[in-house]
């Protein structure tokens, strides 16, 4: 019987891989990318939104997400969009080295190949020359960036006629995962946010930066932090290692009405406390939860270039940015994550196609 079960498991894995290839062929091998502005009254700026989409031949070849540490992913700048109408995934990035939309090109590009349009705003303050701990910790502003991105996509002449506006979901990784939960209806507890960096127990890397930047979370104006950021246009959210989950009002999870898929990277007991989502999965009425045991929180980064770990040490990057589990390469973990995301969004927002 055990041998029979193994055979069935192997056949199922082969069938699933075949299905993913078939789904990809139903999309487009060409992926276009373009920038659009998303005006934000609250931020007082136009958000820079990167959009990946199924494309026809054309455009200029570009590589997005490449850095001294990470490999990039190719796409075609301003290529013509493919015929048809497509579901929309609003993508929220994390902070730090992966604190920009292009850092997630490794997942956005294959999603476009599978027939999704993926739009990701650059959340202000999270990376680059304008990196700011104070702006990064205004977590309650991030869901508004996602809503403004959706508003901009609805008005954009290039995209507006080719999107299925009743088929919109949000995908978030790390801090983007907590953003996805907030746009689904989870509310921040201002006191928990103020207390978040009182110790290093929850997020030593982030909180060290906050303190070194001279930011006192207790002194921040948190009067709007607990507001309702739910956007009812969103049909489904998926959060991968959402962080920080410790700043939410736990009771608000029970009021989330849309389906939610939560994924943690790592084995139970080794998942960062601030990203551990098993308890909130039980609190959300329509949630699923899974783990990828041989991954780590850093598996959400693009594939590391040769020598990246040594460069990180030289640059005094303390996080093990190139460390995954011990049994698989990051590329294999990425393939599994991409397949999980494609399956989830195909089920929840692309079901009519």
Model-derived features: positions:
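Short glycine-enriched nucleophile-adjacent loop
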Residues: 151-154, 177-189
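Short beta-strand/loop motif that positions the catalytic acidic residue
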Residues: 256, 262-264
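Short substrate-entry loop that stabilizes the transition state in hydrolases
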Residues: 71-86, 91-131, 269-272
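Short beta-strand immediately N-terminal to the catalytic nucleophile in serine-hydrolase-like folds
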Residues: 170-172
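Domain-level recognition of soluble alpha/beta enzyme cores
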Residues: 25-91, 113
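Catalytic active-site module of serine/aspartate enzymes centered on a nucleophile-bearing elbow/loop
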Residues: 305-353
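Conserved alpha/beta-hydrolase "acid-adjacent" motif
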Residues: 248, 269-276
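Alpha/beta-hydrolase active-site loop
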Residues: 135-161, 165, 194-210, 223
């Amino acid at each position: 019987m055990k041998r029979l079960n193994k055979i069935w498991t192997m056949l199922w894995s082969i069938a699933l891989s075949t299905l993913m290839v078939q789904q990809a062929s139903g999309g487009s091998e060409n992926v276009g990318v373009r920038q659009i502005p998303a005006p934000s009254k609250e931020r007082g700026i136009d958000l820079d939104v990167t959009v990946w989409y199924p494309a026809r031949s054309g455009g200029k070849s570009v590589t997005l997400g490449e850095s001294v540490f990470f490999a990039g992913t190719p796409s075609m700048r301003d290529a013509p969009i493919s015929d048809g109408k497509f579901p929309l995934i609003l993508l929220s990035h994390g902070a730090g080295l992966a604190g920009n939309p292009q850092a997630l090109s490794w997942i956005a590009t294959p999603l476009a190949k599978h027939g999704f349009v993926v739009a990701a705003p650059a959340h202000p303050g999270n990376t680059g020359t304008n990196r700011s701990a104070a702006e990064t910790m205004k977590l309650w502003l991030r869901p508004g960036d996602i809503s403004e991105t959706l508003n901009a996509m609805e008005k954009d002449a290039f995209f507006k006629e080719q999107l299925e506006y009743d088929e919109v979901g949000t995908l978030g990784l790390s801090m983007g995962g907590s953003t996805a939960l907030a746009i689904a209806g989870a509310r921040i507890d201002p006191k928990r946010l103020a207390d978040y960096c009182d110790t290093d127990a929850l997020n030593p890397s982030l909180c060290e930066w906050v303190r070194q930047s001279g930011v006192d979370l207790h002194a921040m104006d948190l009067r709007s932090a607990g507001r309702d950021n739910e956007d009812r246009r969103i049909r489904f959210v998926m959060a991968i290692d959402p962080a920080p989950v410790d700043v939410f009002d736990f009771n608000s999870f029970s009021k989330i009405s849309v389906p939610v898929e939560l994924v943690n990277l790592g084995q139970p007991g080794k998942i960062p406390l601030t990203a551990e989502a098993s308890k909130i999965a039980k609190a959300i009425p329509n949630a699923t939860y899974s783990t990828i045991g041989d991954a780590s929180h850093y598996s959400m980064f693009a594939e590391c270039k040769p020598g990246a770990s040594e460069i990180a040490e030289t640059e005094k990057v303390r996080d093990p940015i190139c460390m995954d589990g011990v049994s698989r390469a990051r590329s294999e973990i990425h393939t599994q994550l991409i397949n999980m995301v494609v399956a989830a969004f195909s089920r929840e927002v692309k079901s009519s196609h």
